[in-house]
């Protein structure tokens, strides 16, 4: 008799974005003439930068020649890509990394889930609320939690409320925790953390022998020079933090798939017998066993992002999305809504009007404005009464969506 993993049955509902897709499809089928504008899921719309596309094509051509053919590559990623990232993305921040401390993957969503393989189940995990659903759901799936209560909180996870009172930046937990998820710039709230705020977390982690999972998927969208792009800009972070980055939004790789994890050699854990052991070694062992590496053409395309031409073109695309964010942010303010984010992040986090629930506002925008956003409650109980809009649309659609919402709410 084949038994299932019963932990999956603890999940309260379907993953947020498929549920949004289901509702939108049902509306579109019932209203075939409606022009639905999607500002919900954070998928990109701009094409790859020309320099990146050129490198992609050249790498595919390599596979058609005997001399340049590439088969299995190193599971950790090619050194030429890792070194390009370190030189162009970390050294300018004053961060020194070794080649074997970085791992190339097929995306940070997978990494945020897979990293749990090397941590014991009895670790106490702390996550923000609202939060990117993957952090919560993957801990449920592997069996770290009990059942969810009526609010949706799972027994065994420490939830850190992020609200207007704390400017959507969680406070240090009052109890001791072992793993801390931080995401800045934040998804879904669009907020960022200062050096002083991050230093509090690093100090807490080092004092409590905890590990920070730092999701920096949106660091390329930071416009304020005072805001850190990496947790490793903070003194002491290389002893306690694992950082995740993604090419999905930075370079438009949502359909290409490439990400990276930094696991410094100094980040240590404790065995069941009390000995200290490097998480870097564990992650390398896990990677070489369960992953064959990102594809050669994808890594060549990623490398091209860091060329002078590639980065200039990539930055232009990022600027395009951030102009969309400005348009949405200002438009929602003109509509009389309370708005957060959209300055150092491609997400706008707004309060729903007149005390509406998040899903009621979703249905209102869908049926009355034909605009799709993301209900804040889908990111956790503290997201109730909020709503996320994404800046990753086409400019003309963003402008039209904003005008529709303004007209409807005024």
Swiss-Prot record:
Residue list for modification N6-(pyridoxal phosphate)lysine: 249
Cofactor(s) required for function per UniProt: pyridoxal 5'-phosphate
Keywords: Aminotransferase, Pyridoxal phosphate, Transferase
Residues noted as binding substrate in the record, renumbered to the chain: 15, 42, 109, 132, 187, 292, 388
Role noted for this protein: Involved in the synthesis of meso-diaminopimelate (m-DAP or DL-DAP), required for both lysine and peptidoglycan biosynthesis. Catalyzes the direct conversion of tetrahydrodipicolinate to LL-diaminopimelate.
Entry similarity comment: Belongs to the class-I pyridoxal-phosphate-dependent aminotransferase family. LL-diaminopimelate aminotransferase subfamily.
PANTHER family per the UniProt record, alphabetical: AMINOTRANSFERASE (PTHR43144)
Subunit structure: Homodimer.
UniProt protein name: LL-diaminopimelate aminotransferase
Taxonomic placement: Bacteria, Pseudomonadati, Thermodesulfobacteriota, Desulfuromonadia, Geobacterales
Recorded name of the encoding gene: dapL
